């Protein structure tokens, strides 16, 4: 697809994707609340309640979310912004360790009010 514009690629993909698959993807939610945790792809807009977050922010935000120390009502678990290691902050947990480029996938374990990460050796046996 070299030399093709994004819109052309998107149109081709949309045409080739079966309607059943497209309907499934369009029906997915962009966030979830489980207990004291709020899960989303990118993060939230500080100062906006979780139930009023915009789809675009949930999928694309970086700043001011990443530098914010504000409480969000729940502990936000997110990806979208790669880091060398998982980030555990009082108001958020960043789990994007660039698996697409590094091969290191982060596994966050949430047990009651405790959070920890499984070490790579858990998966590799090393």
State what each model feature region is.
Residues 1-94, 98-104, 110-125:
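Acidic, His/Gly-enriched loop-helix segments that form or flank divalent-metal centers
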């Amino acid at each position: 697809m070299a030399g093709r514009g994004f819109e052309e690629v998107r149109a081709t993909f949309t045409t080739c994707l079966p309607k059943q698959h497209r309907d499934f993807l369009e029906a997915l939610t962009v966030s979830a609340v489980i207990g004291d945790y709020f899960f989303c792809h990118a993060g939230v807009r500080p100062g906006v309640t979780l139930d009023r977050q915009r789809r675009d922010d949930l999928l694309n935000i970086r700043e001011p979310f990443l530098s914010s120390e504000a409480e969000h009502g729940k502990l936000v678990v997110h990806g979208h912004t790669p880091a060398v290691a998982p980030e555990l902050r009082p108001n958020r947990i960043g789990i994007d360790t660039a698996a697409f480029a590094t091969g290191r996938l982060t596994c966050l374990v949430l047990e009651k009010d405790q959070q920890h990460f499984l070490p790579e050796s858990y998966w590799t046996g090393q």
